[in-house]
A protein has these predicted regions:
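A conserved amphipathic terminal alpha-helix motif
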Residues: 68, 116-150
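Beta-strand/loop substructures that line and gate deep hydrophobic ligand-binding cavities in soluble
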Residues: 78-129
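Glycine-rich portal/gate segments that line the openings of hydrophobic small-molecule binding cavities
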Residues: 37-82, 137
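Hydrophobic pocket/interface hotspot
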Residues: 16, 26, 66, 109, ...
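Intrinsic-disorder/low-complexity, polar/charged segments enriched in Ser/Thr/Lys/Arg/Asp/Glu/Gln
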Residues: 2-6, 44, 59-61, 74, ...
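Hydrophobic/aromatic beta-strand elements that line small-molecule binding cavities or substrate pockets
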Residues: 5-7, 33, 61-68, 92-100
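Short strand-connecting beta-turns/loops that link adjacent beta-strands
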Residues: 12, 41-42, 71-72, 101-104
Length: 150
């Protein structure tokens, strides 16, 4: 499944870029992210994602690897994790783009998500709705956080 989202933020591209790399502030905007750790700054991170999807409560210990980083412009990353309790795996590819538009920064996401195992048995529709909800909540939280800072 692939998802695309753009959000306009009344902040400079530099401010948005710095926010993305401030792991503690950034993860506070990620719905269901219970904890995150920097393993190698700018390259490798770990996080635990907890969500309710249909009848399942999933907990994915996740590894996030930054594959490309173009300063102030683009980040390409991949993540993967598994919930062994319910026998499900998740893979994510993520492309994040920033572009200045006057006083605003347009923050764009393209995410590809693959779900395997019991969670996949819920069907495309349920998983798609949940993924869209999480992405919308995340975009809203980032916008509120950055626009609320002076």
């Amino acid at each position: 499944m692939q998802f695309e989202k753009e959000v306009e933020i009344l902040a400079s591209r530099e401010k948005v870029w710095n926010f993305i790399w401030d792991v503690d502030r950034f993860i506070a905007c990620v719905p269901g992210c219970k904890e995150a750790k920097t393993i190698e700054a700018g390259k490798l991170y770990s996080a635990t994602m907890v969500e309710k999807v249909g009848p399942f409560r999933v907990e994915f210990p996740t590894t996030i690897e930054v594959l490309e980083r173009d300063e102030l412009t683009r980040i390409r990353a991949q993540a993967s994790g598994a919930d062994n309790k319910i026998g499900s795996r998740m893979k994510l590819s993520l492309d994040v783009n920033l572009r200045q538009d006057g006083e605003k920064t347009v923050l764009g996401f393209i995410a590809g998500i693959d779900i395997l195992g019991k969670l996949a048995a819920l069907g495309h529709g349920i998983i798609k709705r949940k993924a869209e909800q999480v992405l919308d909540e995340f975009a809203h939280a980032v916008k509120q956080r950055l626009e609320g800072e002076s």
